[in-house]
């Protein structure tokens, strides 16, 4: 049995799968226009993909935008994510800028969760996790492989490593090259949940063929999935209304 993780008015826990919807836009006007459309869409949590924001390298502009987004989303929990280019993001930042951006967001009082990518300097990861927790912010630690699905043992190793580094919610997303790859991800999730997990997990197989992994989290052990209202942020994401319908049928 894993420990539940509560963020504002939602709880990540075994046997439940929450729906996260990405908020994407290059300009603040575009972002706010999209944000208003998400409030009534039925998402449990919103992820601002700040790597899509044209002014992401200007800290003051990011924080100003964040304040506007926080107001627009009302009570909805907010996940702050800068996705690096090597893991499927839109923009690249230096390591120094990446950690500074996330630290500022965590300390702002405007976000509820930040995303930290696993494949970074360990000392900087640990320091950022500590800063986030000191500010009352939860941490998703993530890894994304847009080219392949690693071996089951490797997926489990990465998720366990995230736990060891202090992640509240370990996350991995992988790309299948065959139906067997989808089964590999699901088997890794189930094994991790049953043998090693001390907290909720977030896992998915991407692309169209990986879609089954996005709707079976309650069965295999993924506590959050990603749906869309408009533009998707990763291949294989499903429109939120269809996603919830299928999840309800399967449950």
From Swiss-Prot:
It catalyses: 3-dehydroquinate = 3-dehydroshikimate + H2O. It is an enzyme of class 4 (lyase). CDD domains: DHQase_I. 3-dehydroquinate binds at residues 47-49, 83, 214, 233, 237. The active site is at residues 144, 171. GO terms for biological process: 3,4-dihydroxybenzoate biosynthetic process; amino acid biosynthetic process; aromatic amino acid family biosynthetic process; chorismate biosynthetic process. Keywords: Amino-acid biosynthesis, Aromatic amino acid biosynthesis, Lyase, Schiff base. Pathway: Metabolic intermediate biosynthesis; chorismate biosynthesis; chorismate from D-erythrose 4-phosphate and phosphoenolpyruvate: step 3/7. InterPro entries: 3-dehydroquinate_DH_AS, Aldolase_TIM, DHquinase_I, Type-I_3-dehydroquinase. Involved in the third step of the chorismate pathway, which leads to the biosynthesis of aromatic amino acids. Catalyzes the cis-dehydration of 3-dehydroquinate (DHQ) and introduces the first double bond of the aromatic ring to yield 3-dehydroshikimate. Belongs to the type-I 3-dehydroquinase family. Homodimer. NCBIfam families: aroD (TIGR01093). This is 3-dehydroquinate dehydratase.
